[in-house]
């Protein structure tokens, strides 16, 4: 996949982001253009923090303030080989029937990003609340995805996105985790998603 982004200012929308600097406008507009093109290459963006452990990428998504970065930071502390490859907007792509996660330059205020990729192991939507983890059905997961991705600006984009989500939800385990962002939470999500991968591997 190759996408050329010409930062000539032609797509800038200062009327929408009036309080942002020129550089921030470029950052946002180039990101939106990339996400749109990604849909045309069997991929999508997800608002999430992505961490790689034991060769698989795990994504933690949800609204701002739900502790996505906090959760992946706990992975870094607990698992020696953990690498956060993107802390805000990783790219997901289906290549030869397998889903992969890629780092992108659109990585949030802390700039945490690694230009690498890994097979997608699982996705978990975070919420505040007493500790509860459960696997979601495709019907339950879909609304949460739609709130945290791009792809509904045009009918064509929406069609591409829904086709990709249909495949992803059939093949990737998706969970939701209510928590208070305390040490040990990372063990709960890791064990659940790793077990789901193990069950899938046994069927292949």
Regions found by a protein language model. Give the residues of each.
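Post-Walker A alpha-helix
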Residues: 71-72
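Conserved lysine of the Walker
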Residues: 68
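Glycine-rich, often acidic-flanked micro-motifs
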Residues: 49, 53-63, 77-204
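Charged, amphipathic alpha-helical linker segments immediately N-terminal to NTP-binding catalytic cores
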Residues: 1-35, 193-202
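P-loop NTPase catalytic core of nucleic-acid-dependent motor ATPases
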Residues: 18-57, 61
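Ordered hydrophobic segments in well-structured contexts
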Residues: 4-6, 45, 174-176
């Amino acid at each position: 996949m190759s996408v050329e982004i010409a930062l000539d200012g032609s797509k800038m929308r200062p009327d929408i982001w009036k309080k942002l600097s020129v550089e921030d406008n470029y950052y946002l507009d180039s990101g939106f253009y990339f996400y749109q093109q990604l849909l045309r290459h069997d991929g999508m963006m997800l608002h999430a923090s992505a961490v790689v452990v034991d060769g698989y990428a795990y994504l933690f998504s949800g609204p701002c303030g739900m502790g996505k970065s906090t959760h992946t930071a706990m992975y870094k502390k607990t698992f020696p080989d953990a690498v956060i490859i993107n802390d805000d907007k990783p790219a997901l792509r289906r290549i030869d029937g397998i889903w992969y996660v890629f780092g992108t330059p659109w990585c949030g205020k802390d700039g945490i990003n690694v230009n690498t990729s890994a097979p997608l192991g699982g996705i978990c939507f975070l919420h505040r609340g007493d500790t509860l983890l459960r696997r979601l059905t495709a019907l339950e997961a879909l609304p949460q995805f739609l709130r945290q991705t791009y792809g509904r600006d045009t009918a064509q984009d929406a069609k591409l996105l829904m086709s990709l989500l249909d495949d992803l939800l059939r093949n990737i385990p998706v969970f939701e985790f209510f928590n208070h962002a305390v040490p040990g939470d990372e063990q709960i999500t890791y064990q659940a998603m790793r077990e789901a991968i193990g069950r899938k591997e046994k069927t292949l």
